[in-house]
């Protein structure tokens, strides 16, 4: 099985429930990229990802830098393809960090279809269902987060993850207000998208423990391992 066609489309997403912007920042334009890989057997692999501020720019990286690595390859060689993209990104192309992932998903999708299995069984099934939670984008006010969490709770969704827009004092107001609004029996999580210092993360983490948040996602960038080790020593969440 060989990949013979690499297609992508970018779609400007319609407005979400609420305006999306960092505090004091520009409006966030969350475009969507759709990827389709076609093989000589006729099988197709699909994936979708968000493309941050510009779907047009992301699609150009896909076609000019990533597609040449993928075309003509066996989708079973997905690990080799991923590692090649990782090297190219560092040495040559500098494409957005979120682009290799959906290509990898499309490769997995192809191989699962060839095997005649849903992907979760192809990779080794453990359960056949998972709970769903809603996830926010950056919202301008504390009340917007409260309203969004309550909206999703009213639809029967059991959890909500906030992406507070900063600074840290604003984020802590969001955490407290959302917990008060949804009650103690609703699952809450937060993700500041790598925006904290270590001291800020410890301060916020202690608040989250008191408010019974389920997890504290990405307070630092993924490569700041020392900070994560220190944070784990300081917190129980």
Features from the language model and the residues they span:
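Structured beta-strand/loop patches that form or line metal/cofactor-binding pockets in enzymes
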Residues: 1-46, 50-51
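Flexible, glycine/charged-enriched surface loops at secondary-structure junctions
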Residues: 78, 119-122, 215-222
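N-terminal small/glycine-rich loop or linker at the start of catalytic domains
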Residues: 114-140, 174, 179-186
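Non-catalytic positions within long, well-ordered alpha-helices that form the structural scaffold/packing
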Residues: 150-153, 209
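Catalytic core of soluble alpha/beta enzymes
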Residues: 162, 168-237
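Active-site mouth loops of central-metabolism enzymes
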Residues: 93, 129-144, 163-164, 192-198
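Conserved, mostly hydrophobic/aromatic
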Residues: 3, 42, 66, 103, ...
